[in-house]
Amino acid sequence: MKKIHAIVGGVAGGATAAARVRRLDESSEIIVFERGDYISYANCGLPYYIGETIKDWDNLFVQTEESFEARFNVDVRLRNEVLSIDREKKEIQVKDLLKNEVYTIKNDKLLLSPGAEPFKPNIPSIDDSRIFTLRNPEDTKKNKRLYNIKKC
Protein backbone atom coordinates (compact mmCIF):
# COMPACT_ATOMS: atom_id res chain seq x y z
CA MET A 1 0.00 0.00 0.00
CA LYS A 2 1.22 3.51 -0.85
CA LYS A 3 2.45 5.74 1.92
CA ILE A 4 0.36 8.93 2.23
CA HIS A 5 2.06 12.25 2.97
CA ALA A 6 -0.42 14.96 4.01
CA ILE A 7 0.86 18.53 3.83
CA VAL A 8 -1.15 21.33 5.43
CA GLY A 9 -0.47 24.60 3.60
CA GLY A 10 0.37 25.06 -0.05
CA VAL A 11 2.28 28.31 -0.27
CA ALA A 12 6.08 28.55 0.00
CA GLY A 13 6.85 26.03 2.74
CA GLY A 14 4.19 23.46 1.92
CA ALA A 15 4.79 23.51 -1.83
CA THR A 16 8.55 23.25 -1.35
CA ALA A 17 8.09 20.35 1.06
CA ALA A 18 5.77 18.54 -1.36
CA ALA A 19 8.29 18.90 -4.19
CA ARG A 20 11.10 17.65 -1.95
CA VAL A 21 9.10 14.65 -0.71
CA ARG A 22 8.35 13.75 -4.33
CA ARG A 23 12.06 13.87 -5.22
CA LEU A 24 12.87 11.58 -2.29
CA ASP A 25 9.94 9.21 -2.80
CA GLU A 26 8.49 8.73 -6.27
CA SER A 27 5.79 6.26 -5.26
CA SER A 28 4.04 7.82 -2.25
CA GLU A 29 0.76 9.67 -2.47
CA ILE A 30 1.24 13.34 -1.58
CA ILE A 31 -1.77 15.52 -0.77
CA VAL A 32 -1.45 19.27 -0.21
CA PHE A 33 -4.34 21.00 1.57
CA GLU A 34 -4.54 24.77 1.02
CA ARG A 35 -7.53 26.76 2.28
CA GLY A 36 -6.87 29.62 -0.12
CA ASP A 37 -7.28 29.91 -3.87
CA TYR A 38 -3.61 29.69 -4.86
CA ILE A 39 -0.58 27.45 -4.43
CA SER A 40 3.10 28.31 -4.54
CA TYR A 41 2.96 32.08 -5.02
CA ALA A 42 5.66 34.66 -4.42
CA ASN A 43 4.28 36.24 -1.26
CA CYS A 44 7.29 38.56 -0.98
CA GLY A 45 6.31 39.95 -4.39
CA LEU A 46 2.80 41.01 -3.36
CA PRO A 47 3.75 44.60 -2.38
CA TYR A 48 5.56 44.98 -5.70
CA TYR A 49 2.36 44.15 -7.55
CA ILE A 50 0.46 46.78 -5.58
CA GLY A 51 3.19 49.34 -6.27
CA GLU A 52 3.22 48.31 -9.95
CA THR A 53 6.86 47.21 -10.04
CA ILE A 54 5.42 43.82 -10.99
CA LYS A 55 2.75 44.62 -13.56
CA ASP A 56 1.46 41.17 -14.54
CA TRP A 57 -0.63 39.36 -11.90
CA ASP A 58 0.45 35.97 -13.28
CA ASN A 59 4.11 36.75 -12.54
CA LEU A 60 3.33 36.35 -8.81
CA PHE A 61 2.63 32.64 -9.23
CA VAL A 62 5.43 30.11 -9.39
CA GLN A 63 3.00 27.26 -10.11
CA THR A 64 -0.70 26.82 -10.70
CA GLU A 65 -2.65 23.98 -9.17
CA GLU A 66 -2.58 22.14 -12.51
CA SER A 67 1.10 22.71 -13.26
CA PHE A 68 2.15 21.67 -9.75
CA GLU A 69 0.08 18.49 -9.94
CA ALA A 70 1.48 17.63 -13.37
CA ARG A 71 5.11 18.39 -12.54
CA PHE A 72 5.31 16.70 -9.13
CA ASN A 73 2.45 14.17 -9.23
CA VAL A 74 0.88 15.77 -6.16
CA ASP A 75 -2.82 15.94 -5.30
CA VAL A 76 -3.43 19.66 -4.65
CA ARG A 77 -6.66 20.49 -2.85
CA LEU A 78 -7.26 24.22 -2.95
CA ARG A 79 -10.08 25.67 -0.86
CA ASN A 80 -9.76 22.72 1.56
CA GLU A 81 -9.22 23.63 5.20
CA VAL A 82 -7.83 21.20 7.76
CA LEU A 83 -10.11 21.34 10.79
CA SER A 84 -8.50 18.84 13.13
CA ILE A 85 -5.64 16.38 13.46
CA ASP A 86 -5.84 13.06 15.30
CA ARG A 87 -2.22 12.05 15.86
CA GLU A 88 -3.12 8.71 17.45
CA LYS A 89 -5.30 7.56 14.54
CA LYS A 90 -3.12 9.35 11.95
CA GLU A 91 -6.16 11.08 10.49
CA ILE A 92 -6.99 14.62 9.55
CA GLN A 93 -10.45 16.11 9.21
CA VAL A 94 -10.80 18.43 6.22
CA LYS A 95 -13.54 20.77 5.03
CA ASP A 96 -14.01 21.31 1.31
CA LEU A 97 -14.94 24.99 1.37
CA LEU A 98 -16.63 24.92 -2.06
CA LYS A 99 -18.83 21.89 -1.40
CA ASN A 100 -19.23 22.67 2.31
CA GLU A 101 -18.45 19.02 3.05
CA VAL A 102 -16.24 17.55 5.77
CA TYR A 103 -14.19 14.41 5.15
CA THR A 104 -11.42 12.44 6.84
CA ILE A 105 -8.07 11.38 5.35
CA LYS A 106 -5.66 8.85 6.80
CA ASN A 107 -1.97 9.72 6.58
CA ASP A 108 1.37 8.09 7.28
CA LYS A 109 3.31 11.34 7.45
CA LEU A 110 2.01 14.82 8.26
CA LEU A 111 3.78 18.10 7.61
CA LEU A 112 2.37 21.39 8.90
CA SER A 113 3.06 24.58 6.97
CA PRO A 114 -0.11 26.61 7.54
CA GLY A 115 1.39 30.07 7.19
CA ALA A 116 0.63 32.99 9.46
CA GLU A 117 -1.99 35.54 10.31
CA PRO A 118 -1.24 39.27 10.24
CA PHE A 119 -0.83 40.87 13.66
CA LYS A 120 -2.64 44.15 14.29
CA PRO A 121 -1.33 45.85 17.42
CA ASN A 122 -3.78 47.38 19.87
CA ILE A 123 -3.20 51.03 18.97
CA PRO A 124 -5.63 53.89 18.29
CA SER A 125 -7.20 53.89 14.82
CA ILE A 126 -5.91 50.39 13.94
CA ASP A 127 -9.31 49.55 12.45
CA ASP A 128 -9.33 52.63 10.20
CA SER A 129 -10.20 51.69 6.61
CA ARG A 130 -6.89 53.18 5.43
CA ILE A 131 -4.89 50.64 7.44
CA PHE A 132 -4.64 47.20 5.91
CA THR A 133 -2.72 43.96 6.16
CA LEU A 134 -1.06 42.08 3.33
CA ARG A 135 -0.64 38.32 3.57
CA ASN A 136 -2.07 36.63 0.49
CA PRO A 137 -3.32 37.25 -3.07
CA GLU A 138 -6.84 38.03 -1.83
CA ASP A 139 -5.42 40.84 0.36
CA THR A 140 -3.36 42.00 -2.60
CA LYS A 141 -6.39 42.38 -4.87
CA LYS A 142 -8.28 44.32 -2.19
CA ASN A 143 -5.32 46.57 -1.40
CA LYS A 144 -4.54 47.15 -5.09
CA ARG A 145 -8.08 48.48 -5.59
CA LEU A 146 -7.61 50.83 -2.61
CA TYR A 147 -4.19 51.91 -3.90
CA ASN A 148 -5.64 52.70 -7.33
CA ILE A 149 -8.48 54.72 -5.81
CA LYS A 150 -6.39 56.66 -3.30
CA LYS A 151 -2.99 56.59 -5.06
CA CYS A 152 -1.43 56.49 -1.61
What residue spans do the PLM features occupy?
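FAD-binding core/adjacent interface of flavoenzyme oxidoreductases
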Residues: K2-A6, E66-C152
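Beta1-alpha1 glycine-rich phosphate/pyrophosphate-binding loop at the start
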Residues: K2-D75
